[in-house]
């Protein structure tokens, strides 16, 4: 049985968020395929994730005797215990919502999700897999605007730093481009997400 961490990073609610329409369809199909797996949903906005403060940074190093419910380290422990990750985050201002970066600052903890050796940093989350589900208003997968896409590239890089190299992206884009069949794009992406869920 695998443990799936479903990370949601969008201020828009269910039924409004185009990203969540895709990611929820992915999760539903995954649950149908693997009903015995545990799916933990972490909605970053509902969770109230904040930026690391001076006090939090001081507590950002695990110490002997501190449990997994530690208010600063709990997200890193939760992340490390998962086997698979589904990240649902829209494309905002060439990246993703700032709350997701704040969350990443919580989960990148030496001794929990990575460590330092004489050869450099080594990820402690090896052998796991992740999928990033994203919706974009414009087209950034190819062409002249490809260089402006920094959200998926950053996630792929930071997850690789933590040892997670099996990283897939499911994207619906050009959703705000005049003349595009938006409903058709969403419909096709949802079907693609369901197919990906069967193999995840």
Curated annotation (Swiss-Prot):
Q: What Enzyme Commission number does this protein have?
A: 1.6.5.-, 1.7.1.17
* Short name of one Pfam family: Flavodoxin_2
Q: What is this protein called?
A: FMN-dependent NADH:quinone oxidoreductase 2
Q: What job does this protein perform? A: Quinone reductase that provides resistance to thiol-specific stress caused by electrophilic quinones. Also exhibits azoreductase activity. Catalyzes the reductive cleavage of the azo bond in aromatic azo compounds to the corresponding amines.
Keywords assigned: Flavoprotein, FMN, NAD, Oxidoreductase
Subunit structure and binding partners: Homodimer.
Recorded name of the encoding gene: azoR2
CC cofactor note: Binds 1 FMN per subunit.
Top-level taxon: Bacteria
The cofactor named in the record is: FMN
Give the HAMAP family listed for this entry.
Answer: Azoreductase_type1 (MF_01216)
